[in-house]
Amino acid sequence: MAKLVIEVPEEFTEVGKAMAEHLAALQRTVSRLGGGKAVDYAEIEQAMSESAGRTELAGHRAILQSLDIDVPAVIIGGLRYTRVGRCEAPFHTMVGSVSVERSLYRQSGERGGQPGGRVVDPVSLRAGVVEDGWLPRVARAMAHAVQQGPSREAEASAREFGRLRSEERRVGERV
């Protein structure tokens, strides 16, 4: 067996673990296919897609976390915003949702409930998030699917293609 050693930066540890799990799943799959028998390749495709999806989700989490800005104040559109807290929020991708901790900011001098008192999230602003955590590609894909027919048909298509996990399929109703 060939030995391959890769260095994984600390912020990508979860990505490295997901990659190792994906490789282990691949090895288990190949090891049980001997003997010349027919296989249910649709089942193999599904399993490989789910395993690769976990690696993709870990990558999205690392990238989105890197977009966080954790400082006392930021300037957005020429206006000063003050940090009001940090909390986790879900971000929805083509393969599922990831939770990312990020800072929240409010325009300096404003309070909640006032026109300028809306809380902003730099991760969402920097990533071009649509609505409540929908990353651009998943939002665009569902908007496209929904414009071709009812949202239930878009949901069925997404399920058949194996992309857009259950909670993400509902974005079509909101995009």
Regions found by a protein language model. Give the residues of each.
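N-terminal juxtadomain amphipathic helix
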Residues: 73-101
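Electropositive nucleic-acid engagement tracts
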Residues: 43, 47-79, 130, 149-170
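Short, positively charged, Gly/Tyr-enriched micro-motifs
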Residues: 2-14, 18-39, 98-170
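Hydrophobic alpha-helical segments, chiefly the membrane-spanning helices
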Residues: 173-175
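Generic hydrophobic-segment detector
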Residues: 68, 85-86, 144, 148
